[in-house]
A protein has these predicted regions:
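ALDH superfamily catalytic-core signature
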Residues: 1-109, 171, 219-220, 226-227
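Conserved C-terminal structural/oligomerization subdomain of aldehyde/semialdehyde dehydrogenase
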Residues: 44, 92-95, 99-227
Length: 227
């Protein structure tokens, strides 16, 4: 839950790796949504220069209007805005700033607005019945930067890593904040950037394969016996 909340609301939803879609198994969707809403309501929202603040304002009025428009589109598509459809009370003290409450929206399907990057703290909740459906939903958007799965099933994790159409695919950690040091880049309409990651160094390095045997025996391939 902490990973979901951080990825959805961190930097007020204005990261390229922000969690925009939460794809939850239908059997636990109600419980998960209730916990997410409860956690988001407790987030300290305010001046980002003050210690303890976790969510600051949107960057400008245009970003706020984009968020309002996205929520209106979600409603028109049959979505239920459960929480967050308002400016935060902190905005009363700072009327020229755009502090907002993170929004949670349950959607009946993955509509065009769900597949659009708004760069605002909007979390669209979709449900699935089979892992195949969840992976298909994950991939059926124009972007392909960061994705994550939470599971205790190693086979599910391996399938997701193999089939996620994203440059970053995580297991049991959120979409945002775990990518430093690796090759950072995406697929489809998402920009590149892998040349800025540490993996790019390998293009300038010589490679050496090393096998170190710490046993007292001589291991041989293909079951060969020698002396």
């Amino acid at each position: 839950m902490r990973a979901v909340v951080f990825a959805a609301a961190g930097t007020a939803g204005q990261r390229c790796t922000t969690l925009r879609r939460l794809i939850v198994h239908r059997s636990v969707a109600d419980e998960v949504v209730a916990r997410v809403v409860s956690a988001l309501r407790r987030l300290p929202i305010g001046d980002p220069f003050e210690p303890g603040t976790l969510v600051g304002p949107l960057i400008h009025e245009t970003a706020y209007r984009d968020m309002v428009g996205a929520l209106e589109s979600a409603r028109a598509d049959g979505g239920e805005v459960i929480d967050g459809d308002r400016r935060h009370p902190f905005a009363v003290e700072h009327p020229s700033s755009y502090y907002v409450a993170p929004a949670v929206v349950r959607m009946p399907a993955q509509t065009p607005i769900v597949a659009t990057e708004t760069f605002a703290p909007i979390l669209y909740v979709l449900t699935y019945d089979r892992l195949d459906d969840a992976i298909a939903l994950n991939n059926a958007v124009p972007q392909g930067l960061s994705s994550a799965i939470f599971t205790t099933d190693l086979r599910e994790a391996e399938r997701f890593l193999d089939e996620s159409d994203c440059g970053i695919a995580n297991v049991n950690i959120g979409t945002s904040g775990a990518e430093i040091g690796g090759a950072f880049g995406g697929e489809k309409q998402t920009g590149g950037g892998r040349e800025s990651g540490s993996d790019s160094w390998k293009a300038y390095m010589r490679q050496s394969t090393n096998t170190v045997n710490y046993s007292g025996a001589l291991p041989l391939a293909q079951g060969v016996e020698f002396g």
